[in-house]
């Protein structure tokens, strides 16, 4: 049985494919997750994250951008965008505790992205979580 960490990793892969231009990924997300042995509760969890990010993608991007400082969101790599979007969605729109979300995103960064990415993700998501702690979205 898959863990939530594995489910999040699969969601990042789906978001990466979507960001890379694969619009069809929305139609086959469920079957792709099942191929990765993500089933039952974790499948529902993963699909809720994936669909939630896509549903609120413009709002999520607008949440992330002010925390990038000297970076332009459009110039970020697709994997970095995928992880940031997942993290920002969970921080802003789910009841999961922020330290758990940030740690999961750091681990996903270690697994999927460049060596400096985990520090970058930590800084952005920590800044975002502090801002949203003052003015929550939910």
From Swiss-Prot:
GO terms for cellular component: cytosol. GO terms for biological process: DNA-templated transcription termination; transcription antitermination. The keyword Transcription applies. It comes from the Bacteria. The keyword Transcription regulation applies. Keywords: RNA-binding, Transcription, Transcription antitermination, Transcription regulation. InterPro entries: NusB-like_sf, NusB_fam, NusB_RsmB_TIM44. It holds the Pfam family NusB. Belongs to the NusB family. PANTHER family: ANTITERMINATION NUSB DOMAIN-CONTAINING PROTEIN, N UTILIZATION SUBSTANCE PROTEIN B-RELATED. Involved in transcription antitermination. Required for transcription of ribosomal RNA (rRNA) genes. Binds specifically to the boxA antiterminator sequence of the ribosomal RNA (rrn) operons. NCBIfam families: nusB (TIGR01951). This is Transcription antitermination protein NusB. It comes from Helicobacter pylori (strain J99 / ATCC 700824) (Campylobacter pylori J99). The gene is nusB.
């Amino acid at each position: 049985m898959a863990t939530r960490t594995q489910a999040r990793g699969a969601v990042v892969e789906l978001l990466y494919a979507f960001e890379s231009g694969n619009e069809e990924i929305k139609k086959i997300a469920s079957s792709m997750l099942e191929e990765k042995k993500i089933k039952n509760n974790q499948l529902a969890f993963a699909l809720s994250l994936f669909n939630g990010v896509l549903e609120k993608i413009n709002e999520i991007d607008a949440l992330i951008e002010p925390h990038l400082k000297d970076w332009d969101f459009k110039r970020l790599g697709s994997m970095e965008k995928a992880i940031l979007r997942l993290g920002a969605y969970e921080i802003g729109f789910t009841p999961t505790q922020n330290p758990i979300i940030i740690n999961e995103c750091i681990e996903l960064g270690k697994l999927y992205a460049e060596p400096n990415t985990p520090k970058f993700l930590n800084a952005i998501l920590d800044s975002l979580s502090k801002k949203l702690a003052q003015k929550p979205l939910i």
